[in-house]
A protein has these predicted regions:
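Acidic/polar alpha-helix N-cap and adjacent early helical turns
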Residues: 91-98
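Alpha-helix boundary/capping detector
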Residues: 39-40, 79, 83, 96
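AMP-binding/adenylate-forming catalytic domain of the ANL superfamily
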Residues: 59-83
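A short, well-structured catalytic beta-strand-centered motif of the EAL phosphodiesterase domain
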Residues: 85-90
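AMP-binding/adenylate-forming catalytic core of the ANL superfamily
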Residues: 1-65, 91
Length: 98
């Protein structure tokens, strides 16, 4: 398996002007062990296709680092100090995965 750092994927996704904030988590996958899921809030709740976000990130990331799915939320939860709440993101992703 390849080592994927969530922060690297998040940084690439945030370069998309429509992406306001995001967190990346791994969820179980039968084929690869884990699949990358991004929980994304958009600038001013804009509507964008998840395929557009993924293809924009493709310019900055190797294929195996790209999220397999984008799950949209109104706000990405963070602690008062701005620290990412990965536990919330993982639960949110599990509850909203297609």
């Amino acid at each position: 398996g390849e080592k994927i750092y969530p922060e690297e994927v998040e940084e690439a996704l945030k370069k998309d002007p429509v992406v306001f904030d995001c967190l990346v988590v791994g969820l179980p996958d039968d084929r690869f062990g884990q699949k990358i899921i991004a929980v994304v809030s958009t600038e001013n709740d804009q509507i964008i296709a998840e395929t557009d976000i993924i293809s924009n990130a493709r310019e900055r990331l190797a294929g195996y680092k790209l999220p397999k799915q984008i799950i949209f939320c109104s706000e990405v939860r963070r602690a008062p100090n701005g620290k990412a709440d990965y536990k919330w993101a993982k639960t949110f992703a599990e509850e909203n995965i297609k």
